[in-house]
């Protein structure tokens, strides 16, 4: 499976962006990136990580045609970018001052944007967590064919607060094993989020009491809270949907790929640009890397033991996902087979219990409605 492999300079840039945060722990950051403190200090001491451009910063005699060519060059390189982003990047990178409205007019005049694009680009009004790693979104960007007759299933995980892309992985399928391995690598480098939100599809959705999959049980045992989007409500995952539109417009629709290795190479290049160069309108045109910091919750070497508070009735889940409580059989989830679950009495409701896997409430049941033994 083609795991993403950053160049030395990309790794250095990603490290430096995170190392310059006021609250960063340099030793922990070095461990997660697999570099020594000596290397970290050497990188931090350098004035730049690449040769600086020799392009003149100002050109007062620039013609209108030249200005339009610069706008179109940025748009052609990033087809999903609009007037505000292009104007911001031209000023930031080339010291070219141009109004966003002028950029939009140029794009319309050169047929780079359709009259309907403004309506399609209207953003959802959505909740934003107050800090990084409070919420990660996770989903697959559909799948597309490769010239070797295989298919690519892009796994995407952005941080909801900063829009920083944590995972962009080209997978051959949507099975648990590939997703869990990609998450494990991300947890080692970036730490654990407080919560992950997904839709209700495989491999993270299931039906029935508890509705858990093996992947979800693993995430819960790591101390991560889980939530699911409401069916047929894409605005719940609006930032993930927007990320997918950009990925499709700027990468998937612009290339024909031979195999997963080639896809991953292009994904890595685009991911770096998305995190470190692309301004995002919602957080004041800052790049995601400017707003992101790694989680202080490190990935544990082993899964912690499962514990429940006093007052819970603990039962071990038997084959088929069943537990027994007061001579009554309760169905949980087959993914919990062999694991202890907590049955927590519901206040002011005799015979009713909340069903818990570690910290996560996975359902409720009433003894009067269950199957008596």
What residue ranges belong to the model's regions?
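Short, amphipathic alpha-helical "recognition" segments used to contact nucleic acids or chromatin
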Residues: 6-24, 68-77
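Mobile genetic element proteins and their domesticated derivatives, centered on retroelements
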Residues: 15, 29, 40-43, 70-71, ...
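Short alpha-helical "recognition helix" segments of helix-turn-helix
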Residues: 26-33, 86, 90
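Basic, flexible linker segments flanking DNA-binding modules
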Residues: 45-138, 143, 202, 213, ...
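Mobile-element integrase/transposase regions
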Residues: 65, 96, 101, 105-164, ...
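Acidic/histidine-rich, metal-coordinating catalytic segments
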Residues: 174, 183, 187-208, 230-232, ...
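Charged alpha-helix within mobile-element recombinases
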Residues: 208, 215-300
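C-terminal, beta-rich DNA-binding module of retroviral/retroelements integrases
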Residues: 271, 275-373
């Amino acid at each position: 499976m083609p795991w993403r492999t950053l160049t030395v300079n990309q790794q250095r840039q990603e490290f430096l962006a995170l190392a310059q945060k006021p609250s960063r722990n340099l030793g922990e950051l070095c461990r997660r990136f697999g570099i020594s403190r000596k290397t970290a200090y050497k990188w931090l001491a350098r004035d730049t990580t690449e040769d600086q451009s020799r392009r003149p910063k100002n050109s007062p005699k620039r013609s209108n045609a030249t200005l339009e060519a610069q706008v179109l060059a940025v748009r052609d390189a990033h087809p999903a970018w609009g007037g505000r982003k292009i104007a911001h990047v031209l000023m930031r990178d080339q010291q070219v001052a141009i109004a966003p409205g002028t950029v939009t007019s140029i794009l319309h005049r050169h047929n780079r944007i359709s009259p309907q694009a403004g309506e399609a680009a209207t953003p959802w009004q959505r909740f934003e967590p107050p800090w990084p790693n409070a919420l990660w979104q996770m989903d697959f960007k559909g799948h597309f064919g490769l010239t070797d007759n295989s298919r690519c299933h892009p796994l995407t995980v952005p941080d909801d607060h900063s829009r920083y892309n944590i995972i962009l992985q080209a997978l051959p399928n949507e099975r648990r094993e590939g997703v869990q391995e990609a998450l494990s690598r991300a947890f080692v480098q970036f730490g654990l989020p407080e919560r992950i939100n997904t839709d209700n599809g495989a491999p993270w959705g299931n039906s029935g009491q508890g509705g858990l999959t093996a992947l979800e049980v693993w995430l819960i045992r790591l101390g991560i809270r889980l939530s699911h989007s409401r069916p047929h409500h894409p605005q719940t995952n609006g930032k993930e949907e927007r990320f997918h539109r950009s990925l499709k417009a700027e990468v998937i629709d612009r290339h024909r790929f031979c195999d997963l290795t080639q896809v991953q190479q292009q994904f890595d290049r685009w991911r770096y640009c998305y995190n470190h160069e692309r301004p995002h309108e919602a957080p004041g045109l800052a790049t995601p890397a400017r707003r992101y910091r790694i989680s202080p919750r490190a990935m544990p070497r082993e899964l912690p033991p499962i514990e429940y508070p006093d007052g819970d009735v603990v039962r071990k889940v038997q084959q088929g996902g069943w537990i027994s409580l007061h001579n009554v059989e309760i169905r949980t989830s087959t993914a919990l087979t062999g694991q202890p679950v907590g049955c927590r009495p519901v206040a002011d409701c005799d015979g009713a219990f909340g069903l818990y896997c570690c910290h996560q409430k996975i359902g409720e049941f009433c003894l009067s409605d269950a199957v008596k033994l």
